[in-house]
Amino acid sequence: MALLDFFLSRKKNTANIAKERLQIIVAERRRGDAEPHYLPQLRKDILEVICKYVQIDPEMVSVQLEQRDGDISILELNVTLPETEESKP
């Protein structure tokens, strides 16, 4: 019976395929546009606080916000600190 279903089944029409692809694209863009408007200012404020204590290059600070499962947000902060004189060989 499965063999008969295989030969008699109709292929998906192009409209349905296009709709599925469009839904995937929209979902990907929503995930990428989830960055809140306050994130650049937050990065600037964090950089100012760090610079009070350590001289660093602003490019060495990375702030990212990741959203998971709709109600969970993860703020990731990466700071590359310069080597201190004591730790150099």
From Swiss-Prot:
Pfam families the record matches: MinE
Entry keyword Cell cycle: yes
GO annotation (BP), single: regulation of division septum assembly
InterPro entries for the chain: MinE, MinE_sf
Keyword field: Cell cycle, Cell division
Signal peptide: none
Entry annotated with the keyword Transmembrane: no
Functional summary from the UniProt entry: Prevents the cell division inhibition by proteins MinC and MinD at internal division sites while permitting inhibition at polar sites. This ensures cell division at the proper site by restricting the formation of a division septum at the midpoint of the long axis of the cell.
Family statement: Belongs to the MinE family.
Protein name: Cell division topological specificity factor
